[in-house]
Amino acid sequence: MNRPLRHIAIFCGLLVLALLLRANWLQHVDRQELAQHERNARVRFERFSTPRGDIIVGGKAITGSKETESRDYAFRRTSKEGPMYAPVTGYASQSRGTSLLERTYDSVLSGQDDRFAFRHAKDILTGQPRRGGDVITTIDAKAQKAGYKGLTDLGARGAVVALDPRTGKVLALVSTPSYNPEVFAGISFKESDRFTALEKKKDKPLANRPL
């Protein structure tokens, strides 16, 4: 074999080796990350296959789940006083994924956390549907409402954060202008367009100003 052909053969061999190593990396190292990625359809289906757990403020749920007619997305997220609490909860959208508490505690809210394994086994034996777990916040409903009302009455673009000086617990987390996570919680093109419209607004309602 002459020298140019030998160089080409070596190059092709190295290229094949690199591709094999990359495929092996994806299969064995990145498998878990890819399996849990938000763009993975299976992840999205599982997230909305059962009622999500609630996010709790002052002993009351400020989120919920509503049954749909979709086979793939059996439930969609609902919000109570959505604009006031959006800087706390974030959103859980069938088309846009999750943010803030909805993302941080997604495995708990969707019931996929390993700590629920025993409960899921019990539910299967008793014929109960799988349930998500609740997330209890330190937010004080009165403080949150006062901060939100103060900013909206002024028509201001700003933020309010209130902390307990003794413990550091977050009592209020307000950002205005805000948005209602429920209006784009579904998978429809119309709801996706609503999210896009919010992204394009000059006053940036999706921005979480306290953070």
State where each predicted segment sits:
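Extracytoplasmic/periplasmic proteins that interact with beta-lactams or build/remodel peptidoglycan
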Residues: 1-159, 173-210
